[in-house]
Amino acid sequence: MAKTPAEKPATAAKKPAAPKAAAAPKAAAAKAPAAAKAPAAKKPAAPKAAAAPKAPAAGLEGATGRLVQIIGAVVDIEFDGALPAILNAVETVNTATGQRLVFEVAQHLGQSTVRAIAMDATEGLVRGQPVRDTGEPIRVPVGPGTLGRIMNVIGEPIDEQGPIRSDISRTIHRDAPSFAEQTNTAEVLVTGIKVIDLMCPYTKGGKIGLFGGAGVGKTVTMQELINNIAKAYGGYSVLAGVGERTREGNDLYHEMIESNVNVDPKANNGSTEGSRCALVYGQMNEPPGARARVALTGLSIAEYFRDEEGKDVLLFVDNIFRFTQAGAEVSALLGRIPSAVGYQPTLATEMGNLQERITSTNKGSITSVQAIYVPADDLTDPAPATSFAHLDATTVLSRDIAAQAIFPAVDPLDSTSRIMDPLVIGEEHYTVARRVQEVLQQYKALKDIIAILGMDELSEEDKLVVARARKIQRFLSQPFHVAEQFTNTPGAFVQLKDTIRSFKGIVDGEYDHLPEGAFYMVGPIEEAVAKAEKMAAEA
Protein backbone atom coordinates (compact mmCIF):
# COMPACT_ATOMS: atom_id res chain seq x y z
CA MET A 1 0.00 0.00 0.00
CA ALA A 2 2.58 2.53 1.01
CA LYS A 3 4.61 2.24 -2.20
CA THR A 4 1.99 3.76 -4.48
CA PRO A 5 2.91 7.46 -4.10
CA ALA A 6 6.39 6.78 -5.37
CA GLU A 7 5.44 4.34 -8.16
CA LYS A 8 5.26 6.85 -11.00
CA PRO A 9 8.64 8.41 -10.29
CA ALA A 10 10.11 4.94 -9.86
CA THR A 11 9.23 3.82 -13.41
CA ALA A 12 10.54 7.07 -14.84
CA ALA A 13 13.68 6.84 -12.78
CA LYS A 14 14.47 3.35 -13.98
CA LYS A 15 14.71 4.26 -17.70
CA PRO A 16 18.23 5.68 -17.62
CA ALA A 17 19.51 2.73 -15.59
CA ALA A 18 20.53 0.62 -18.62
CA PRO A 19 22.93 3.08 -20.30
CA LYS A 20 24.37 4.02 -16.90
CA ALA A 21 25.23 0.43 -16.08
CA ALA A 22 27.53 0.24 -19.09
CA ALA A 23 29.25 3.48 -18.21
CA ALA A 24 29.65 2.76 -14.53
CA PRO A 25 30.58 -0.89 -13.93
CA LYS A 26 30.94 -0.33 -10.19
CA ALA A 27 27.36 0.80 -9.85
CA ALA A 28 26.08 -2.01 -12.07
CA ALA A 29 26.51 -4.64 -9.40
CA ALA A 30 24.53 -2.58 -6.93
CA LYS A 31 21.81 -1.77 -9.43
CA ALA A 32 21.32 -5.23 -10.84
CA PRO A 33 19.60 -6.62 -7.73
CA ALA A 34 17.68 -3.39 -7.37
CA ALA A 35 16.39 -3.67 -10.92
CA ALA A 36 15.41 -7.24 -10.28
CA LYS A 37 13.63 -6.40 -7.06
CA ALA A 38 11.80 -3.31 -8.28
CA PRO A 39 9.13 -5.13 -10.32
CA ALA A 40 8.50 -7.50 -7.41
CA ALA A 41 8.10 -4.55 -5.09
CA LYS A 42 5.64 -2.92 -7.47
CA LYS A 43 3.32 -5.91 -7.88
CA PRO A 44 1.42 -5.65 -4.56
CA ALA A 45 0.59 -1.99 -5.21
CA ALA A 46 -2.90 -2.19 -6.64
CA PRO A 47 -5.02 0.73 -7.93
CA LYS A 48 -7.31 0.38 -4.90
CA ALA A 49 -4.53 1.79 -2.68
CA ALA A 50 -3.81 4.77 -4.91
CA ALA A 51 -5.63 7.36 -2.79
CA ALA A 52 -4.85 6.14 0.73
CA PRO A 53 -1.09 6.52 1.17
CA LYS A 54 -0.57 9.84 -0.60
CA ALA A 55 -0.66 11.90 2.62
CA PRO A 56 2.87 11.17 3.86
CA ALA A 57 4.55 12.33 0.64
CA ALA A 58 2.08 15.08 -0.28
CA GLY A 59 3.47 18.33 -1.61
CA LEU A 60 7.02 17.04 -2.05
CA GLU A 61 8.97 18.46 -4.95
CA GLY A 62 12.47 17.68 -6.10
CA ALA A 63 14.62 14.97 -7.56
CA THR A 64 13.68 11.32 -7.25
CA GLY A 65 16.25 8.70 -6.34
CA ARG A 66 16.35 5.10 -5.21
CA LEU A 67 17.96 3.23 -2.33
CA VAL A 68 21.08 1.32 -3.36
CA GLN A 69 22.51 0.37 0.04
CA ILE A 70 21.15 0.12 3.60
CA ILE A 71 23.65 -0.14 6.48
CA GLY A 72 21.68 0.15 9.71
CA ALA A 73 20.87 3.81 10.33
CA VAL A 74 22.78 4.96 7.23
CA VAL A 75 21.59 4.52 3.63
CA ASP A 76 23.00 5.30 0.19
CA ILE A 77 20.62 6.84 -2.36
CA GLU A 78 21.31 7.22 -6.08
CA PHE A 79 19.79 10.14 -7.98
CA ASP A 80 19.47 10.45 -11.75
CA GLY A 81 19.32 14.24 -11.81
CA ALA A 82 20.51 16.95 -9.44
CA LEU A 83 21.69 15.75 -6.04
CA PRO A 84 19.97 17.05 -2.88
CA ALA A 85 22.05 19.50 -0.84
CA ILE A 86 23.86 18.45 2.33
CA LEU A 87 21.40 18.51 5.31
CA ASN A 88 18.38 18.27 2.99
CA ALA A 89 15.58 15.96 4.08
CA VAL A 90 14.69 13.13 1.70
CA GLU A 91 11.64 10.95 2.23
CA THR A 92 10.25 7.57 1.41
CA VAL A 93 7.52 5.32 2.78
CA ASN A 94 8.57 2.30 4.82
CA THR A 95 6.80 -0.60 3.15
CA ALA A 96 6.81 -2.62 6.39
CA THR A 97 4.98 0.00 8.47
CA GLY A 98 3.34 2.27 5.89
CA GLN A 99 4.85 5.24 7.73
CA ARG A 100 6.78 8.17 6.29
CA LEU A 101 10.52 7.74 6.82
CA VAL A 102 12.80 10.78 6.67
CA PHE A 103 16.54 10.80 6.00
CA GLU A 104 19.00 13.66 6.28
CA VAL A 105 21.68 13.93 3.59
CA ALA A 106 25.14 13.78 5.18
CA GLN A 107 27.57 13.17 2.31
CA HIS A 108 27.91 13.24 -1.48
CA LEU A 109 29.77 10.08 -2.46
CA GLY A 110 30.19 10.62 -6.21
CA GLN A 111 28.55 8.66 -9.07
CA SER A 112 25.27 10.51 -8.36
CA THR A 113 25.01 8.91 -4.90
CA VAL A 114 24.41 10.51 -1.50
CA ARG A 115 24.73 9.01 1.97
CA ALA A 116 21.95 9.88 4.40
CA ILE A 117 21.08 9.25 8.06
CA ALA A 118 17.68 7.76 8.91
CA MET A 119 15.45 9.47 11.50
CA ASP A 120 13.61 6.21 12.26
CA ALA A 121 14.13 2.46 12.03
CA THR A 122 15.18 1.22 8.58
CA GLU A 123 13.81 -2.31 8.96
CA GLY A 124 11.48 -3.00 6.03
CA LEU A 125 13.30 -0.86 3.47
CA VAL A 126 14.41 -2.54 0.22
CA ARG A 127 17.00 -1.64 -2.40
CA GLY A 128 15.52 0.05 -5.42
CA GLN A 129 12.83 1.72 -3.32
CA PRO A 130 12.07 5.27 -4.56
CA VAL A 131 13.06 8.28 -2.44
CA ARG A 132 12.06 11.94 -2.92
CA ASP A 133 14.11 15.04 -2.15
CA THR A 134 12.09 17.63 -0.19
CA GLY A 135 14.39 20.45 -1.30
CA GLU A 136 15.04 21.71 2.27
CA PRO A 137 16.15 20.49 5.73
CA ILE A 138 13.72 18.76 8.10
CA ARG A 139 10.79 21.12 8.75
CA VAL A 140 8.80 20.99 11.99
CA PRO A 141 5.76 22.85 13.36
CA VAL A 142 6.50 25.73 15.74
CA GLY A 143 4.44 28.35 17.55
CA PRO A 144 1.72 28.27 20.23
CA GLY A 145 0.15 25.13 18.71
CA THR A 146 3.10 23.07 19.95
CA LEU A 147 2.59 23.98 23.63
CA GLY A 148 1.28 21.09 25.68
CA ARG A 149 2.10 18.60 22.92
CA ILE A 150 4.79 15.92 22.50
CA MET A 151 6.41 15.57 19.09
CA ASN A 152 9.27 13.57 17.64
CA VAL A 153 12.34 14.74 15.73
CA ILE A 154 10.45 15.32 12.46
CA GLY A 155 7.58 17.18 14.12
CA GLU A 156 5.02 14.37 14.21
CA PRO A 157 2.81 14.19 17.33
CA ILE A 158 3.46 11.14 19.53
CA ASP A 159 1.01 11.89 22.36
CA GLU A 160 -2.05 10.35 20.65
CA GLN A 161 -3.89 13.69 20.76
CA GLY A 162 -4.33 14.17 17.02
CA PRO A 163 -2.41 16.45 14.67
CA ILE A 164 -0.55 19.51 15.98
CA ARG A 165 -2.63 22.59 15.17
CA SER A 166 -0.01 24.98 13.86
CA ASP A 167 0.23 26.81 10.54
CA ILE A 168 3.82 27.87 11.23
CA SER A 169 6.85 25.69 10.57
CA ARG A 170 10.62 26.07 10.57
CA THR A 171 13.59 24.06 9.37
CA ILE A 172 15.76 22.61 12.14
CA HIS A 173 19.06 23.82 10.65
CA ARG A 174 19.50 27.57 11.01
CA ASP A 175 22.35 30.03 11.42
CA ALA A 176 23.18 31.37 14.87
CA PRO A 177 22.21 35.02 15.50
CA SER A 178 24.83 37.53 14.38
CA PHE A 179 26.95 39.44 16.90
CA ALA A 180 24.91 42.58 16.20
CA GLU A 181 21.69 40.79 17.26
CA GLN A 182 23.06 39.23 20.45
CA THR A 183 22.74 40.82 23.87
CA ASN A 184 24.46 40.01 27.13
CA THR A 185 22.60 40.69 30.35
CA ALA A 186 23.69 39.70 33.84
CA GLU A 187 20.48 39.11 35.77
CA VAL A 188 20.29 36.36 38.41
CA LEU A 189 17.71 33.64 37.76
CA VAL A 190 16.46 32.43 41.15
CA THR A 191 15.91 28.66 41.21
CA GLY A 192 14.78 28.20 44.83
CA ILE A 193 17.55 25.58 45.31
CA LYS A 194 19.92 26.83 48.04
CA VAL A 195 23.20 25.35 46.85
CA ILE A 196 22.69 26.57 43.28
CA ASP A 197 21.49 30.07 44.15
CA LEU A 198 24.35 30.60 46.62
CA MET A 199 27.37 28.86 45.09
CA CYS A 200 26.80 28.88 41.30
CA PRO A 201 23.97 31.35 40.53
CA TYR A 202 22.30 31.02 37.15
CA THR A 203 21.95 33.93 34.77
CA LYS A 204 18.82 34.77 32.83
CA GLY A 205 19.49 34.13 29.16
CA GLY A 206 22.55 32.00 29.94
CA LYS A 207 23.58 28.40 29.33
CA ILE A 208 23.72 26.15 32.37
CA GLY A 209 25.23 22.66 32.55
CA LEU A 210 24.32 19.95 35.08
CA PHE A 211 27.30 17.58 35.06
CA GLY A 212 27.20 14.18 36.71
CA GLY A 213 27.80 10.47 36.30
CA ALA A 214 25.13 7.79 36.23
CA GLY A 215 22.62 7.90 39.07
CA VAL A 216 23.74 11.03 40.94
CA GLY A 217 20.54 13.00 40.31
CA LYS A 218 20.85 15.00 37.07
CA THR A 219 17.33 14.32 35.85
CA VAL A 220 15.70 14.83 39.27
CA THR A 221 17.55 18.14 39.69
CA MET A 222 16.44 19.19 36.21
CA GLN A 223 12.84 18.20 36.99
CA GLU A 224 13.00 20.36 40.13
CA LEU A 225 14.35 23.26 38.09
CA ILE A 226 11.50 22.81 35.61
CA ASN A 227 9.03 22.71 38.50
CA ASN A 228 10.49 25.77 40.26
CA ILE A 229 11.41 27.99 37.32
CA ALA A 230 8.70 27.12 34.78
CA LYS A 231 5.92 27.48 37.37
CA ALA A 232 7.22 30.66 39.03
CA TYR A 233 8.40 32.11 35.77
CA GLY A 234 5.13 31.77 33.86
CA GLY A 235 6.75 32.04 30.42
CA TYR A 236 7.13 29.44 27.68
CA SER A 237 9.36 26.40 28.09
CA VAL A 238 10.65 23.74 25.70
CA LEU A 239 11.92 20.36 26.88
CA ALA A 240 14.09 18.29 24.53
CA GLY A 241 14.44 14.68 25.70
CA VAL A 242 17.60 13.50 23.96
CA GLY A 243 18.35 9.81 24.34
CA GLU A 244 17.03 9.47 27.89
CA ARG A 245 14.51 7.09 29.48
CA THR A 246 11.03 6.99 27.97
CA ARG A 247 9.58 6.42 31.46
CA GLU A 248 11.06 9.71 32.68
CA GLY A 249 9.64 11.52 29.66
CA ASN A 250 6.21 10.07 30.36
CA ASP A 251 6.42 10.97 34.07
CA LEU A 252 7.46 14.52 33.21
CA TYR A 253 4.53 14.96 30.82
CA HIS A 254 2.04 13.96 33.54
CA GLU A 255 3.81 16.00 36.23
CA MET A 256 3.51 19.10 34.05
CA ILE A 257 -0.23 18.53 33.78
CA GLU A 258 -0.55 17.95 37.54
CA SER A 259 1.40 21.14 38.33
CA ASN A 260 -0.71 23.17 35.83
CA VAL A 261 2.26 24.02 33.61
CA ASN A 262 0.36 22.23 30.84
CA VAL A 263 -3.36 21.67 30.25
CA ASP A 264 -4.72 18.11 30.17
CA PRO A 265 -6.27 17.70 26.69
CA LYS A 266 -8.52 14.89 27.95
CA ALA A 267 -10.17 17.29 30.39
CA ASN A 268 -10.31 20.13 27.86
CA ASN A 269 -12.05 18.61 24.82
CA GLY A 270 -8.74 17.70 23.20
CA SER A 271 -7.37 21.26 23.42
CA THR A 272 -4.02 22.17 25.04
CA GLU A 273 -4.71 25.91 24.98
CA GLY A 274 -3.21 27.56 28.05
CA SER A 275 -0.21 25.18 28.18
CA ARG A 276 3.23 26.70 28.62
CA CYS A 277 5.64 23.91 27.70
CA ALA A 278 6.34 22.04 24.45
CA LEU A 279 8.00 18.62 24.63
CA VAL A 280 10.20 17.06 21.94
CA TYR A 281 11.35 13.49 22.53
CA GLY A 282 13.94 11.30 20.84
CA GLN A 283 14.49 8.76 23.59
CA MET A 284 17.17 6.10 24.06
CA ASN A 285 15.30 3.48 22.02
CA GLU A 286 15.33 5.75 18.96
CA PRO A 287 17.86 5.38 16.12
CA PRO A 288 20.98 7.59 16.38
CA GLY A 289 19.74 9.91 13.62
CA ALA A 290 16.76 10.95 15.75
CA ARG A 291 18.89 11.41 18.88
CA ALA A 292 21.41 13.49 16.96
CA ARG A 293 18.75 15.92 15.68
CA VAL A 294 16.01 16.09 18.33
CA ALA A 295 17.85 18.82 20.27
CA LEU A 296 17.79 20.95 17.10
CA THR A 297 14.03 20.36 16.77
CA GLY A 298 13.44 21.59 20.33
CA LEU A 299 15.78 24.53 19.76
CA SER A 300 13.88 25.55 16.60
CA ILE A 301 10.66 25.80 18.63
CA ALA A 302 12.41 27.90 21.30
CA GLU A 303 13.97 30.15 18.63
CA TYR A 304 10.55 30.89 17.15
CA PHE A 305 9.21 32.11 20.51
CA ARG A 306 12.35 34.21 21.00
CA ASP A 307 12.56 35.71 17.50
CA GLU A 308 8.93 36.06 16.39
CA GLU A 309 7.07 36.55 19.69
CA GLY A 310 9.84 38.28 21.66
CA LYS A 311 9.54 35.86 24.58
CA ASP A 312 12.06 34.87 27.24
CA VAL A 313 12.12 31.10 26.76
CA LEU A 314 13.41 28.28 28.94
CA LEU A 315 15.06 25.39 27.06
CA PHE A 316 15.70 22.18 28.98
CA VAL A 317 17.86 19.50 27.33
CA ASP A 318 18.18 16.06 28.91
CA ASN A 319 20.80 14.83 27.98
CA ILE A 320 23.32 16.71 25.83
CA PHE A 321 25.82 13.81 26.07
CA ARG A 322 23.40 11.59 24.13
CA PHE A 323 23.51 14.16 21.32
CA THR A 324 27.28 13.60 21.13
CA GLN A 325 26.91 9.85 21.55
CA ALA A 326 24.45 9.62 18.65
CA GLY A 327 26.89 11.50 16.43
CA ALA A 328 29.62 9.02 17.38
CA GLU A 329 27.33 6.09 16.50
CA VAL A 330 26.77 7.22 12.92
CA SER A 331 30.25 8.68 12.43
CA ALA A 332 31.90 5.34 11.65
CA LEU A 333 29.07 4.37 9.29
CA LEU A 334 29.69 7.65 7.46
CA GLY A 335 33.32 6.61 6.97
CA ARG A 336 34.90 9.16 9.31
CA ILE A 337 38.08 8.32 11.20
CA PRO A 338 37.29 8.53 14.94
CA SER A 339 39.20 10.92 17.17
CA ALA A 340 40.00 10.63 20.89
CA VAL A 341 38.11 7.92 22.83
CA GLY A 342 36.22 6.97 19.67
CA TYR A 343 34.24 10.20 19.32
CA GLN A 344 33.50 11.72 15.93
CA PRO A 345 36.20 14.06 14.57
CA THR A 346 33.52 16.76 14.13
CA LEU A 347 32.60 16.76 17.85
CA ALA A 348 33.59 20.38 18.56
CA THR A 349 31.91 21.66 15.39
CA GLU A 350 28.61 19.86 16.08
CA MET A 351 28.55 21.06 19.69
CA GLY A 352 29.39 24.61 18.60
CA ASN A 353 26.64 24.69 15.96
CA LEU A 354 24.07 23.70 18.60
CA GLN A 355 25.32 25.86 21.47
CA GLU A 356 25.84 29.06 19.45
CA ARG A 357 22.14 29.09 18.53
CA ILE A 358 21.18 28.99 22.23
CA THR A 359 21.63 32.67 22.97
CA SER A 360 19.83 35.89 23.85
CA THR A 361 19.09 38.52 21.22
CA ASN A 362 17.63 42.02 21.22
CA LYS A 363 14.22 40.38 20.60
CA GLY A 364 14.13 37.86 23.44
CA SER A 365 16.20 35.34 25.39
CA ILE A 366 16.71 31.60 25.66
CA THR A 367 17.81 30.35 29.08
CA SER A 368 19.12 26.83 28.65
CA VAL A 369 19.55 24.14 31.31
CA GLN A 370 21.39 21.10 29.98
CA ALA A 371 21.97 17.82 31.79
CA ILE A 372 25.36 16.43 30.75
CA TYR A 373 26.26 12.82 31.54
CA VAL A 374 29.89 12.34 32.56
CA PRO A 375 31.18 8.91 31.45
CA ALA A 376 32.91 7.08 34.32
CA ASP A 377 32.77 10.34 36.35
CA ASP A 378 35.64 11.67 34.20
CA LEU A 379 35.17 15.40 33.56
CA THR A 380 38.11 15.34 31.12
CA ASP A 381 36.24 13.02 28.73
CA PRO A 382 35.97 14.84 25.36
CA ALA A 383 32.15 14.89 25.37
CA PRO A 384 31.57 16.81 28.65
CA ALA A 385 34.83 18.75 28.21
CA THR A 386 33.64 20.14 24.86
CA SER A 387 30.51 21.51 26.57
CA PHE A 388 32.40 23.45 29.26
CA ALA A 389 33.55 26.23 26.95
CA HIS A 390 29.97 27.14 25.98
CA LEU A 391 28.44 27.36 29.46
CA ASP A 392 27.82 30.35 31.74
CA ALA A 393 27.35 28.21 34.85
CA THR A 394 28.43 24.65 35.63
CA THR A 395 26.74 22.65 38.37
CA VAL A 396 28.78 19.51 39.11
CA LEU A 397 27.00 16.63 40.85
CA SER A 398 29.38 14.50 42.92
CA ARG A 399 29.12 10.78 43.63
CA ASP A 400 30.95 11.26 46.96
CA ILE A 401 28.32 13.75 48.12
CA ALA A 402 25.49 11.51 46.86
CA ALA A 403 27.04 8.64 48.86
CA GLN A 404 26.52 10.75 52.01
CA ALA A 405 22.79 10.98 51.09
CA ILE A 406 23.08 14.74 50.59
CA PHE A 407 20.74 15.72 47.77
CA PRO A 408 20.99 17.59 45.49
CA ALA A 409 24.54 16.19 45.34
CA VAL A 410 26.04 19.46 44.07
CA ASP A 411 29.76 19.89 44.70
CA PRO A 412 30.04 23.50 45.98
CA LEU A 413 33.81 23.60 45.35
CA ASP A 414 33.66 22.30 41.77
CA SER A 415 30.61 24.26 40.58
CA THR A 416 31.18 27.67 39.01
CA SER A 417 29.28 30.61 37.56
CA ARG A 418 30.29 33.45 35.27
CA ILE A 419 28.25 35.93 37.31
CA MET A 420 29.92 35.11 40.64
CA ASP A 421 30.95 38.75 40.88
CA PRO A 422 30.04 41.31 43.57
CA LEU A 423 29.11 43.82 40.85
CA VAL A 424 26.41 41.41 39.59
CA ILE A 425 25.14 39.43 42.57
CA GLY A 426 25.88 41.99 45.27
CA GLU A 427 28.61 42.30 47.89
CA GLU A 428 26.80 40.36 50.63
CA HIS A 429 25.95 37.37 48.41
CA TYR A 430 29.51 37.21 47.07
CA THR A 431 31.10 37.47 50.52
CA VAL A 432 28.88 34.78 52.08
CA ALA A 433 29.46 32.39 49.16
CA ARG A 434 33.24 32.82 49.37
CA ARG A 435 33.22 32.34 53.16
CA VAL A 436 31.21 29.13 52.77
CA GLN A 437 33.73 27.90 50.18
CA GLU A 438 36.63 28.75 52.50
CA VAL A 439 35.12 26.74 55.37
CA LEU A 440 34.45 23.75 53.11
CA GLN A 441 37.95 23.95 51.61
CA GLN A 442 39.53 24.03 55.08
CA TYR A 443 37.46 20.99 56.08
CA LYS A 444 38.58 19.17 52.93
CA ALA A 445 42.22 19.86 53.82
CA LEU A 446 41.69 18.60 57.40
CA LYS A 447 40.03 15.32 56.34
CA ASP A 448 43.34 13.49 55.93
CA ILE A 449 44.48 14.53 59.42
CA ILE A 450 41.13 13.44 60.88
CA ALA A 451 41.35 10.08 59.09
CA ILE A 452 44.83 9.37 60.48
CA LEU A 453 44.87 11.02 63.92
CA GLY A 454 41.20 11.59 64.72
CA MET A 455 39.29 14.71 65.76
CA ASP A 456 40.98 14.92 69.18
CA GLU A 457 44.30 15.97 67.64
CA LEU A 458 42.80 19.08 66.03
CA SER A 459 43.10 22.53 67.57
CA GLU A 460 39.98 24.14 68.99
CA GLU A 461 39.85 26.49 66.00
CA ASP A 462 40.03 23.58 63.55
CA LYS A 463 37.35 21.68 65.47
CA LEU A 464 35.06 24.70 65.06
CA VAL A 465 35.78 24.80 61.30
CA VAL A 466 34.93 21.09 60.99
CA ALA A 467 31.70 21.48 62.96
CA ARG A 468 30.54 24.43 60.84
CA ALA A 469 31.58 22.73 57.60
CA ARG A 470 29.55 19.62 58.43
CA LYS A 471 26.53 21.79 59.22
CA ILE A 472 26.97 23.67 55.93
CA GLN A 473 27.22 20.37 54.02
CA ARG A 474 23.95 19.16 55.51
CA PHE A 475 22.26 22.54 55.07
CA LEU A 476 23.14 22.45 51.36
CA SER A 477 20.71 19.52 51.09
CA GLN A 478 17.08 20.30 50.36
CA PRO A 479 13.80 18.39 49.93
CA PHE A 480 12.52 18.54 46.34
CA HIS A 481 8.92 18.97 45.24
CA VAL A 482 9.34 16.36 42.50
CA ALA A 483 10.62 13.80 45.04
CA GLU A 484 7.78 14.23 47.57
CA GLN A 485 6.16 10.94 46.56
CA PHE A 486 9.41 9.08 47.36
CA THR A 487 10.54 10.92 50.51
CA ASN A 488 7.19 11.90 52.08
CA THR A 489 8.87 15.26 52.84
CA PRO A 490 7.26 18.42 51.43
CA GLY A 491 9.46 20.20 48.89
CA ALA A 492 11.02 23.56 49.77
CA PHE A 493 11.49 26.65 47.59
CA VAL A 494 13.93 28.99 49.36
CA GLN A 495 14.12 32.65 48.38
CA LEU A 496 17.59 34.01 47.62
CA LYS A 497 17.58 36.51 50.50
CA ASP A 498 16.69 33.70 52.95
CA THR A 499 19.48 31.51 51.55
CA ILE A 500 22.09 34.26 52.00
CA ARG A 501 20.84 35.13 55.51
CA SER A 502 20.81 31.47 56.58
CA PHE A 503 24.37 30.67 55.46
CA LYS A 504 25.67 33.97 56.86
CA GLY A 505 24.31 32.94 60.25
CA ILE A 506 26.04 29.54 60.07
CA VAL A 507 29.50 30.89 59.13
CA ASP A 508 29.15 33.65 61.76
CA GLY A 509 28.60 30.98 64.43
CA GLU A 510 25.03 31.97 65.32
CA TYR A 511 23.89 28.33 65.11
CA ASP A 512 26.92 26.56 66.61
CA HIS A 513 24.67 25.28 69.41
CA LEU A 514 22.37 23.34 67.05
CA PRO A 515 23.08 19.66 66.30
CA GLU A 516 24.23 18.63 62.79
CA GLY A 517 21.11 16.56 62.15
CA ALA A 518 18.88 19.63 62.42
CA PHE A 519 20.38 21.08 59.23
CA TYR A 520 19.65 18.04 57.06
CA MET A 521 16.89 18.23 54.43
CA VAL A 522 15.31 21.52 55.47
CA GLY A 523 14.49 24.79 53.69
CA PRO A 524 15.46 28.11 55.36
CA ILE A 525 17.31 28.25 58.69
CA GLU A 526 14.04 28.66 60.64
CA GLU A 527 13.15 25.07 59.72
CA ALA A 528 16.52 23.88 61.06
CA VAL A 529 15.89 25.68 64.36
CA ALA A 530 12.41 24.16 64.62
CA LYS A 531 13.81 20.71 63.80
CA ALA A 532 16.47 21.10 66.53
CA GLU A 533 13.79 21.99 69.09
CA LYS A 534 11.77 18.96 68.04
CA MET A 535 14.84 16.71 68.36
CA ALA A 536 15.55 18.11 71.82
CA ALA A 537 11.95 17.51 72.91
CA GLU A 538 12.06 13.90 71.70
CA ALA A 539 15.44 13.17 73.31
Curated annotation (Swiss-Prot):
Record SMART domains: AAA
Region (Disordered), start-end ranges: 1-44
Membrane topology type: Peripheral membrane protein
Localization annotation: Cell inner membrane
InterPro entries: AAA+_ATPase, ATP-synt_VA_C, ATP_synth_F1_bsu, ATPase_a/bsu_AS, ATPase_alpha/beta_chains, ATPase_F1/V1/A1_a/bsu_N, ATPase_F1/V1/A1_a/bsu_N_sf, ATPase_F1/V1/A1_a/bsu_nucl-bd
Top-level lineage group: Bacteria
Subcellular location, principal: membrane
Signal peptide: none
Keyword tRNA processing (UniProt): no
Stored Pfam families: ATP-synt_ab, ATP-synt_ab_N, ATP-synt_VA_C
GO MF term list: ATP binding; ATP hydrolysis activity; proton-transporting ATP synthase activity, rotational mechanism
Catalysis: reaction(s): ATP + H2O + 4 H(+)(in) = ADP + phosphate + 5 H(+)(out)
Entry binding sites for ATP: 212-219
Gene3D superfamilies, sorted: 2.40.10.170, Bovine Mitochondrial F1-atpase, Atp Synthase Beta Chain, Chain D, domain 3, P-loop containing nucleotide triphosphate hydrolases
Transport in keyword set: yes
CDD domains in the record: ATP-synt_F1_beta_C, ATP-synt_F1_beta_N, F1-ATPase_beta_CD
Swiss-Prot/TrEMBL keywords: ATP synthesis, ATP-binding, Cell inner membrane, Cell membrane, CF(1), Hydrogen ion transport, Ion transport, Membrane, Nucleotide-binding, Translocase, Transport
GO cellular component: plasma membrane; proton-transporting ATP synthase complex
NCBIfam families from the UniProt entry: atpD (TIGR01039)
Family according to the record: Belongs to the ATPase alpha/beta chains family.
Subunit structure, interactors included: F-type ATPases have 2 components, CF(1) - the catalytic core - and CF(0) - the membrane proton channel. CF(1) has five subunits: alpha(3), beta(3), gamma(1), delta(1), epsilon(1). CF(0) has three main subunits: a(1), b(2) and c(9-12). The alpha and beta chains form an alternating ring which encloses part of the gamma chain. CF(1) is attached to CF(0) by a central stalk formed by the gamma and epsilon chains, while a peripheral stalk is formed by the delta and b chains.
Name the record gives this protein: ATP synthase subunit beta
Protein species of origin: Caulobacter vibrioides (strain ATCC 19089 / CIP 103742 / CB 15) (Caulobacter crescentus)
